[in-house]
A protein has these predicted regions:
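Membrane-targeting and insertion segments and their boundary/processing signals
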Residues: 10, 31, 151-154
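Beta/alpha (TIM)-barrel catalytic core signal, keyed to glycine-rich beta->alpha loops juxtaposed to Asp/Glu
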Residues: 44-180
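Short, acidic/polar
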Residues: 13-31, 52, 75-81, 103
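Active-site groove signature of glycoside hydrolases
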Residues: 28-47
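Structural motif corresponding to the early beta-alpha repeats
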Residues: 1-17, 42
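Metal-dependent phosphodiesterase/phospholipase catalytic core, i.e.
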Residues: 4, 20, 36-38
């Protein structure tokens, strides 16, 4: 499959220039591709130096190895500090109907204002993992809607995210073979 037909994301944590480059080079080899669509800085670090990240990202971008830079699990203030040095295009964060924190704490508002895309990891949240009071409350609303719209619970949970004005892109996966 050609690179143009499959968006690729890569995550790493050590934010030194040499480690960023090594991570990109190793990922390109393992993925057998020429470039990465989005390089994600996987989580905030108190040791991150935005100038170093910016310079190495710009070098990799000039070389055609990376197209966009994003972050994962960064707060609005952490994104702002990094954006003083380099432009961010994505923040991958936990967001679901059972974990609405970024919707109400200003994170998605900040991202929308800064034109930073949102990717949601664990987009189904704890809905299928536990039988909590929260799940029971949500089920009272979702089950009738699933019947009305002839869809499954997971489809409706994903639709809830996708319909958000922040245009949240769910990152889906499973640890259960039966859910595939």
């Amino acid at each position: 499959m050609p690179c143009e037909a499959r968006p690729l994301s890569v995550k790493h944590y050590d934010y030194s220039a040499s480690h960023i480059r090594m991570s990109v080079e190793n990922s390109l080899l393992k993925l057998q591709t020429d470039y990465i669509d989005v390089l994600l800085l996987h989580r905030p670090s108190p040791l991150i130096d935005g100038a170093i990240v910016a310079e190495e990202f710009q070098n990799l971008q000039k070389e055609g190895k990376v197209k966009q830079l994003g972050v994962s699990n960064f707060t609005p203030s952490q994104m702002q500090l990094l954006q003083k040095e380099v432009s961010l295009t994505w923040n991958q964060l936990e967001c679901s109907l059972t974990y609405e924190v970024p919707i109400f704490d200003g994170t998605l508002d900040h991202m929308k204002y800064q034109n930073i895309g949102a990717m949601a990891w664990s987009p189904l949240g704890s809905y299928f993992k536990e039988n909590s009071i929260q799940k029971q409350r949500i089920q009272k609303v979702i089950v009738p809607l699933c019947n009305k719209y002839n869809c499954s619970e997971d489809q409706l949970l994903l639709a809830w995210l996708i319909c958000n004005p922040s245009k949240i892109y769910p990152v889906v996966g499973t640890t259960s073979v039966k859910r595939m």
